Each structure stands twice: as C-alpha cells, then as structure tokens.
Amino acid sequence: MNEEQRYRLRTPASGRFFEEARRHLPGGDSRSTLFYPPWPAVLDRGEGCRVWDLDGNRLLDFTGNHSILVHGYRHPAVTDAIHRQLDRGTCFPGPTEAQLALARHLVGRIASLELVRFTNSGTEAVMMALRAARRYTGRRLVAKLEGGFHGTAEDVMGSVHPDLVLLPAGDAEAAAGMLDRRREDIAALLVEPVQGSAGMIPLDAGFLHAMRDATRRLGIVLVFDEVVSLRVSHGGAQEHYGIRPDMTCLGKLIGGGLPLGAFGGRREIMALFDPSHGAPAIPHPGSYNANPVSLASGLATLELLTREAVAGLNRMGDRLRAELRRVFDEAGVSVAITGLGSLFGIHLTDRAVRTVRDAVESDAAMRHRIFLGLYNEGILLDPRGVGTLSTAIGEREVEQLLDALRRVLAQLGSPAAAGNA
C-alpha cells in the first residue's frame, strides 16, 4: 500500500467533505494553495502545536497556518485579548484605542516604521505601499525580484505585467544595472528578504545591501515585504540584515490568527495618507481597516514574541535545519535545506538552493509522497515542502518530526514502496 492509499484510508471524512464542497465552491475551497491530491484534509480544531482533522487524526503542526500562528493554536493570552475586545464590540465607525496600541508597538519595534497604517491583509498592505511609492516619486513602474511573492494584486502577482520590471535575485550587478537603465520610470523595488513561497529562501546579505545602495542612489523607494519574514528577528529581517528600507509591509502573524495587514515607513511618504489638513493625496478607505478584534489579537501575539522568544525559536530552527540535512543524508536522498530563524524549506535536489531558479529543480513528485507519508505519521507540513516553528513546539516535537521523517524515507526507499509509486 502506498502513501496515497494510506492517506485515503485515514481521511475518508475529508474526502466526503471535499466532494460536497466542490458542489458549492470551485475546487472546494477559497484558498488555492491549500489543495493537494487526492483531497486536502479538513482540519476541525487546534490546540497548542496540534490539530485534529474530521476523522479524528491528531497531527503535530509544523505550518502554523503558513507562518501565522507563531504561538500555536488558542494561546490563552491571545484568546483572552480577543474575548475582551469582543465584549466591547467588533467594529466601530471611528478610531479605537486598540489601533493606537498596536501602532505604538510596531513603530517601537521596527526601525523603518516612522508611521504606520492598517489594512486587512498583506496583499492590501503591498498595494497601498506601492500606491504611496508611485505618488511620492511620480513614477509608474515597480521592480520586484524573481521568486518573490507579494500577494494577489494584479501588477505584482505574476512575472509579466506592463508596470512590472522583474530583476534576477542574487545577481547584484545585473539587478542594479536594470534599475539604473529604468531609473526615470521605477517608483519602487519590492523585496521579500526571505522568499516564502519560493521555498523559504533567504536572500544573500550582500545582494540586499547592494539593492539598498542602488535604490538610495536612484531615488527608488525600497519596500520590504516582511509578511513572512518579520519573525526571523525581533525587528524583522531588516534588523537581521542591518538594512533600513523606506517602507515595510506586514501581515500574517501580526493579526495573531485574525485578518490584519499593515504598511508604514518614512514620515514624508506616509504623510500622503494624512487627511487632517484637507483631502489626502492618497485616499485609504476601508470598512474593516484596523478592525479592533484583529488589533487586540495582534498586540497580544507580538507582546509574547519577545527578543528572548525569538532567540529561542531561532535556536530551534538552526537545530532543526541541521538535523533535517542529517536525516536525508543518512537515507541517501539528495536535499537542500533552506530557511532562516524559525522558517525552513526542504528542496529535493542535489544542488545548492540560493534562488528560486535553483529551487525549481526540486523533485515535486517525491516531495508529495513525503508530505503524504508524514501526514500518515501524524505530522503536518506544507505540501510545498516548507514549514515554520511556533513557541508551542519544543525539542520533543522536533524529535517526533525527525523520527517520522526517518520512517517515511525508509518506507519510500524500500522495494515495495518503489513498486507502488
């Protein structure tokens, strides 16, 4: 019996749910990245670092809902903050104390944020940051790096758009040259310091510093998309790399499991949104902007994510990446392990992975078999081979992941498994 057959036997309720959901939702869901064959498991509840599916299978979760839940599921301090705000109201037609509290925290925590505004997602944060860069510079084009994912806005989602200039990640000379040639047209360079969707690939520090130098020289607004990478240091990847961008976009974990995004940066750029002296240069309406329940959840989450907590996560991440390499090496499976801090990526390739171009060589079929095999062993990873740690995960849980991976690789390497592939 192969991995998929075992998965089908373990998740029949999810299979039935999926067939019913497809009658009402295209693909059975509203989030494309969650699909994998034969059907995605339907998760029913979570507690700490564990989730349960509809069939009652208990799994150790190494996704944190794709890096959002940095403290795991239902952390008491976070749920208490949510309940307190719910008792006061879910939304209001005016500013709230919750908004000021989280704004004050973020401005004090992240060096590049002189002023900040809130949105409902990282996608919206990127959209507003780019709108500001265009208005501030009077230019239209946006440059981004190969492999960077910045949400689902039309002009940055793909790699081909009339307003988009695509730069090679990792090649500082070529990227700077392309910026220089279009210097009169490029408003912003959008950078994901750790490229999450590409496979948790941290960009080279020298390359990032070169991009900071080039954008400063050319008058291009440097925008760091820290939706995923905020967790790698107390002040985000920008603190880790020692780079101060002009603007920063946030999302995912800053809502503590509820929808929230934020963007901010230099005072003179953010002043374009200020309506207190007349009509703002850039309007920023939104009925759910700065929702107080999300803000309360986010503040509780970030207050728990102290420097000490981040350091502990990063130490565990360093150890996990080293041990993952060891397990694959012992099994004779070629692998490149990427990541930074509490983020990790597994690439089934015999070449070093420094950019997305290296990552495309990964064996996708083998990766899927490992994913299903780990699910059958009670371990939940992202089907794309990436994962994150949470403060709810300890050394014992890391060992459980490593032991499960050893069993899966041993099964995949057996003659019977090869015949059932």
Locations of the language-model features?
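Conserved N-terminal phosphate-binding loop of PLP-dependent enzymes in the Aspartate aminotransferase
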Residues: 1-421
